[in-house]
Amino acid sequence: MSMKPCPETFPYPLIALDETDSTNRYISQLCNELQESVAELTTVTAEFQTAGKGQRGNTWEAERGKNLLFSFVLHPTFLEARRQFILSQIVSLSIKEELDRWSDEITIKWPNDIYWRDKKICGILIENDLSGHFIGRSISGIGININQNEFHSDAPNPVSLKQITGQEHDRYEILSHILKRVQIYYNGLQTEDSGTYTAEITARYARSLFRRRGFHPYEDAGGKFSARLLRVEQDGRFVLEDENGKEREYLFKEVQYII
C-alpha cells in the first residue's frame, strides 16, 4: 500500500495510506508491534478502506479520495475503565465543534454519530483496551463525509460537507483542527482534580444531542414507541421518558432512533 502526500507541517504523527482494509486495524497492529513507542494522537489516514466498519458492523461507504477516513490512538492510563464513555464524548464533541464552522445544525446522535439535520455526516467507532481497572489504549476510528457528491450504498441518510456548503474542503486542515480539539479536551481530563471539567464535557455533550427536545420515535426489543430524551448518564446509559411517563434506560445497541 502506497503513502499519500501530506502536509509537511501537519502537527501530529501521521501515516497517510492510499488504501487499507481498516485504519483501526492498521493502527492497532502498529501499537501491538511497537508498544509504548506509538505517540499519543498518532493518526492513520486512508484514501480508501476495503473493510471500514461502523458501530453495528455496517460498512462505511466512502468514495476514494473524497472523505476523511482515519484512526488515532490515545493512551489514557489515568482513566478508570468505568469512565471510558468520556472518551466517546470528547471525540464526538471535537468533530461536532469543527463542523459547527459551516452549519449550526450539527448534532451528536447518541452515542457518537454526527448528524446534520436528519442526515449522517460522520460515524465513529471507538475501541478501548483495558489494563486492570484502567484504560490502557483507546483507538478512535472515524469516517467523515467531506467532498463526496453522490452516495450509492443502501445507507439510508448520508450527507457530505460539500453537499451542505456547496464547496470543496481541505481534508487535512479539518483533520488537524479535530485532533487539536481532541488534544485540548484530553489534556483537560489529564489535569483535572475535582471533576468540574468532566461535568463541563457532559453538559456540552447534552446540549449537542440529536433530538434533545420533544417526543420522537424509537424502537427497542419490545417494538416501536415515542419518547423524549431525559439525560445521558456518565457511563453512557441513554435515559428516555415515554408518553406514559415511564423512564426507559438503555445501553449501547439496545435502542434505535427511527429516522
Predicted regions and their residues:
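Short loop/edge segments at beta-strand edges and connector loops
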Residues: 18, 108-110
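N-terminal lobe of the biotin/lipoate ligase/transferase fold
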Residues: 1-101, 122
